[in-house]
Amino acid sequence: MNLNKNNNSVEDSVSSDLIDLECTFESMGLDNRILRALKKMGFQNPSLVQSKSIPLSLQGKDILAKARTGSGKTAAYSIPIIQKVLMAKEKSNIKGVKAVVLVPTRELCEQVKNHFNQVSYYCQQLVSVVQLGNDKTLDEQKGLLRDIPDVIVSTPTRLVQHLENKTIQLQSTLDILVIDEADLVLNYGHQNDINIIKSFLPKVCQCFLMSATLTKEVEELKKLVLHTPAVLKLEEDKAIQTNLSEYSIKCAEVDKFLLVFSLLRLRLMQGKILFFVNDTNNCYKLKLFFERFHIKCAVLNSELPINSRHDIILQFNKGLFDYLIATDESFKSDSNKKEEQELEDNENEDDDDDDDEMTDVKKEDDEENEDEEENDEENEEDEENEEDEEDEENEEDDDEEENEEDDDKKNKNKKINNSKGDKEYGVARGIDFRNVDIVVNFDFPRTIKNYIHRIGRTARGTNKGIALSFVTYHNEELLKKVSKTRGDAGYNLKPFEFKMNAIEGFRYRVEDVLRTIGIRAIKEAKKTELKQELLNNEKLKSHFSENPQDLLALKHDTTLIKKQVPLHLRVVPEYLLPTQFKNHADQKLEIIPSRPQSGHHGTTGRSLGVNKKLEQKKRKKDILKTLSIKKNTTLTGEELAQARSKSLIKRLKIKEGNISADGSYKTVKVQKKGANNNRRKLIVD
């Protein structure tokens, strides 16, 4: 089965089945500058959630919107915020923070800020937006806040720090509070932060809650911050055909590497691919595995600096590399085992309150019917084959390495919760990865919710997409629950038809490479990557803020392998290919530069040196090149002797009298002139 698809369309911001064709932005009474910006962004008609929420929010209503990813929730609150800021500026020039947008992750801070900049494109001088999700210190961010922005985008934790330090004042000027991805905000443990923020808000403040699911926690949050809200539910007809094709394939742990290599090598997977793994170690293990086979890729995880993470997402979206390995650690925040059961119970409850104004929208969230159950403990996977791999690493320091490896073995089964990763990192949900053709769950998600969020990174807008999940025996029970949930929601998670015996010829290469990727190799790769990204991060802070075009000079898909990667691994001999592919397969994968030269990232310095030496060696064997004689030149014996004499005189710097008439030189001995003199001289017998 071939996973490839043709997808040349530009990604729309909202799925076509969620567009309200009966409504226009012009009919909402929006500022002309906003309308021009929306047109520039390609917005023709509002989405269903936008057509209902924007008029209500402009009337001052609190909004609780439940809608799936890709339904246009961000524009549903950004448009009325900018409209109200412009209206306030016409009445008064008093500076003050007019709106605060809270998001769960630092990655979303940058994305939401960029969206605000797009909507306010023609009025940027009047509407200032600051995001506090970067890695600047509180003191550095004070400079950004000194001019008092109109809109602040932040994570709850960082906003609390500024409120407690009194660098942000909200009591007298704040008009709107938005909590985007409200269910995820609570999952990340921000409940206490929300309570603190609430104490700094004015008594009268319009609030938005945007969420993909309505859990009990969201209901409690609704009571805390909303007053007589309009509740918008996106109800989707199950019969609607999805653009997403979902597949799963059961395999052993080691076979995941065999499968991913074979699918890429045989061109069964092509295009822009997003790989999800469950922890940082697996992230670098998969990257090192790809590098051994000269496959370019980049990694995205919580240990990288936030500026580098932003830039990696930007470069991936621009198509500078096609393979991105992302660590999804969101399951760590799902500590409450009742969470998914509560979600199911809540979906069946009547959300109508006596004080609530209900507005039903025509589509239903594909996550509405999730009967998700937490399954963290039974689905944790052991790290594979580390014991065998360690024996291959750096034999010269055996004693020292054995001690380190023993420590690694003791700690290898521990969760990585205590890593130095950013607690506000998250990419499986909300992040706009553009034009992703295939999502590969290299490590199967820990929960049903995580599965749904991951596969939502593809098939966005009107585009088609494919989700492929590798399932080991640890995950088979969870796979059954995922399949049931997706089936109940009107989707079909199908088994992937693939004959493993057809790729057995690749097994020895894959397993040989895996033996070289032990714990030490992974640790070294992490150190190398972190050092490089820290360097990139410093550059990003200063120069690249003023020269965004120079971002192309930074590469996040460079190789982490210090040693020369065997060149024979970049090609696969024809005898290893399955019969049906021998006449079609391209013999080469995309090649990683083994050692970039300064000033030219795409050239391999070492390979050039090797080629030069080979050329010199061939030249020495070719008498015509040695004597500087062109090919197809006719020479007499005497002329050849003269040419050889000139060559000897030039190369050996000997006197003409020491050369015989036939062009050969007389027998000579090499003799040192003295013990302290390294010069040699020729003595003629």
Swiss-Prot record:
Motif (DEAD box): 180-183
GO molecular function, one term: ATP hydrolysis activity
Ranges of biased composition (kind: Acidic residues): 341-358, 365-407
Ranges for domain Helicase ATP-binding: 54-232
EC number(s) from the headed UniProt entry: 3.6.4.13
Family designation: Belongs to the DEAD box helicase family. DDX56/DBP9 subfamily.
Stated name of the protein: Probable ATP-dependent RNA helicase ddx56
